[in-house]
Amino acid sequence: MKKILMGLLATGLVSGFTACTDLEPTLYSNLTTSNAYITEKDFNAALVGVYADLNPFPGDAWQYYAGYFVMITDYTTDIGYSTSSDPLAMSVMSYDSNNQYLRDNWRYIYQVVSNANTVLQKLNNAEVDMTEENKQLIAAQLKFLRALAYRDLTDAFGPVPLVTEYAENPLAMRDMPLTSVADIDAFILKDLKEALEVLPEKWTGTDLSRATKGAAATLIGQIYMRAHDYQNAKTYIDMVLALRDKGIYSLNPDFKNVWAESNKYDMGSIFCILHEVTSNGGEIANHFGPSDHPEVQGRWQFYAISLPFWRKYDDADPRKQFFYFNYTGVSPRDDKTDYGFYYMMPEKGQNTPPNDTTKLLLNVATKKYTYEMVSDLYYDGSTISIFRLADVILCKAEIENNLNGPGAALPYLNEIRERAGAPLYGKDPRFPVPASQEAMNQAILDERGFELVFEYKRRPDLIRFGKYEETVNAHLKEMDITGTTVTPDMRYLPYPMTETKLNSYMEAENPKRLPK
């Protein structure tokens, strides 16, 4: 079976380049390293393998966008909360550089970079019977995937080694200097703009979830937004909204149906990962689904929402009900009865259940990845959203507010709330129109949390809006969690210990990033 050298930093960028990983188990047959890149079919198979790295399968079907990524995007914020081991450490800001979620996210994200580098370099050097158009199309998708991975790495870790080619000598990668976020942005923006010219507006059939013009424009716009370059961001976010005007995208009128398993590719989807139970099923339902629930059975509630964040939803917002709470479990509570415990959402400050047959929830599971499931098998058919139209509309609200003020942002903010059935700003007396740019930014940030919860957005959002330390410290106080005060140095996570042992630049940087 064909295996591609995997580029991971330090233990990745050194030992990882001598390790191997299957790119796509059903496509490679008897290919070897020497004969893997001969035909156009070979390159398309390798490309599919790089897409698969976003959501490794089988065996690692919980890594990167299949769930693990949430630990460095929605945990270490006010959203994610778990009660055991390394997830608890991420929840309460007591993590260290040996935390498995830092180590494994780093490893799997760099796997995308490395495999994209390998295929791109082989593609550029290959003499293969392929049209120039098809060659450019494969390259454009690889550049998009590599750019997405670098965006995710720099969101989490800031400066990282910029690796753009296949490493013939892995030892040369040891102790690589760190490249600034600005320089990495310049590199991936160039790649993305080249890809934008080549990628189609949409794909069909089995290629439906591949990278498109809309996906590339969304990523470009969000990279500019991260740098607070709202003028350039507007150009690319407006491109995506123009595609909506052409009928490429539209908002599903029911926010819940965005997540129905039968709705594999939602009309508002811009870039996503599709699953089929029988071929490439995921484990996202296992990790995000409710524990001991009568309708969604056999799930673990491993990743869940903090109760203080859930309480921020207005009671009149239907999205507040899109979680699992106040239900009777299916597992008998003891050997004397067939009845399960009642899992109750506690009132704020309530610490004691009303009786011995009730358990107070410590966190709450979202319905996003288990809504109207078609199958109750271990592997699920849930779709994982990476970019969707609601996100882009809220990006537009943020851009307009920062360029033109609250009035220009209001229609876009209310568009998302209206679709959800939530009270509208300026229509409900409890929600007056935010009068200042600062107040509107807070409203947009809040709305991004409500709409995009557990979609890998929260930590980058809080940092971009300049609200990370304030929000997380207030959250820790409300949770009565002591011992850590979040500082600006903690906006970037510590580099994994496995990497710092082989990279002096990371080792020198890490102490200030650790919780104190």
Task: Name each region found by the language model.
Residues 42, 47, 55-58, 76-108, ...:
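Elongated scaffold/linker segments in the mid-to-C-terminal portions of large proteins
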Residues 44, 48, 52-58, 82-157, ...:
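Conserved, well-structured interaction surfaces
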Residues 4, 8, 20-71, 108, ...:
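Acidic, glycine-rich segments characteristic of secretory precursors and extracytoplasmic regions
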Residues 34, 61-82, 163-165, 200-219, ...:
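Short, surface-exposed recognition loops and adjoining beta-strand edges that mediate ligand/DNA contacts
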